[in-house]
Amino acid sequence: MDPFRFQVEARAGRARVGRLFTPHGAVETPLFMPVGTAGSVKGLMPKDLEAIGSQVLLTNTYHLLLRPGPERVRALGGLHGFAGWKGPWLTDSGGFQVMSLGHMRRIDEEGVVFQSHLDGRLIKLTPERSIAVQEALGADLIMAFDECPPYPSPREYLEASLERTLRWLERSLKAKTRPDQALFGIAQGGTDPELRRRSTLETIRFDLPGYAIGGLAVGEPKEAMFAMVELSTRLLPEDRPRYLMGVGHPEDLVAAMGLGVDLFDCVYPTRTGRFGSALVPEGRLNLKNARFLEDRRPLEEGCDCYTCQTFGRAYLAHLVRAGEMLGGILLSLHNLRHLHRLTEAARQAIREGRYGDFAREFARRRFGREVPPWFREALAAGGHG
């Protein structure tokens, strides 16, 4: 039997609950994946992540290629043996980090030559090399090598980039040798509907175990972003998981889940925590603010995370203002649990056929009377209007 299967178990409009089977366990979707950039989620142990309901962890091919190196990880048992997380892993292809972090020297048909941000050495990353690195790392879900154009980009560049990404997908697929890893293709096209449609339809032709919506959440307006998400989920196969890359703001998750997205990742909840802010239903609490210094309340009433069950806002504000690392750790723990609770509540609402009510209640608390048009339009397009 194929170690990878995806089955849709419930629907409400275009929102759906699914179950994704991998060699390291089955997970329920929609879900949010914490990002462990260098093989760890900053400040949090695997047992902490398991306790708050994390199901899949993401790590970055680019960073692990630079250090400790893929062959060392392979020799030490792959990610599952090396990093202590026994559940499913997802590795990205390295393409986005090359564009955003590495000092890119050249991009051509062969691949990308970039200068390491660590030591300045020149490194060449091709589709074949990206797949080889991901096979050495041993994640359950791996990504085809792609080019993520910046926003805004000229249409000519977007078109050339998406065609190159499709050719790189074909090379990634040919380079793949491990049957115990599922390769996802990534659709690009920026915010151009015609190019996004073409990229999505051409990517589907490869009949892959899953598909990612790439090239969004890179600075474009929310209206444009969700128009592309709506278009993409309308075109992508119903029986495959859909992954919206780099998206982690709660309101974005609620809108995208309503359109049928299954997987999300982002550094936002942990980075926000390290910078001293907590996610709550009304938005964010900046714990650097003096008004929290005598506030005994938990960050979020009803939250079952260790942070909320143990500490008040006053203590957390003290830690943040004192620069204590524990402050960032406790806020990161809460912020991830906040997103996991959000996706858990979404799954329950979908199973009960009331996703529209769930999303409207979310919007009432998050936005008050000023619900942005893009959010309302996304809900209506998902059948929750």
Swiss-Prot record:
InterPro entries: TGT, TGT-like_sf, tRNA_ribo_trans-like. Keywords: Glycosyltransferase, Metal-binding, Queuosine biosynthesis, Transferase, tRNA processing, Zinc. Its EC number is 2.4.2.29. Substrate binds at residues 92-96, 146, 188, 215. It comes from the Bacteria. GO terms for biological process: queuosine biosynthetic process; tRNA-guanine transglycosylation. The active site is at residues 92, 265. This is Queuine tRNA-ribosyltransferase. The gene is tgt.
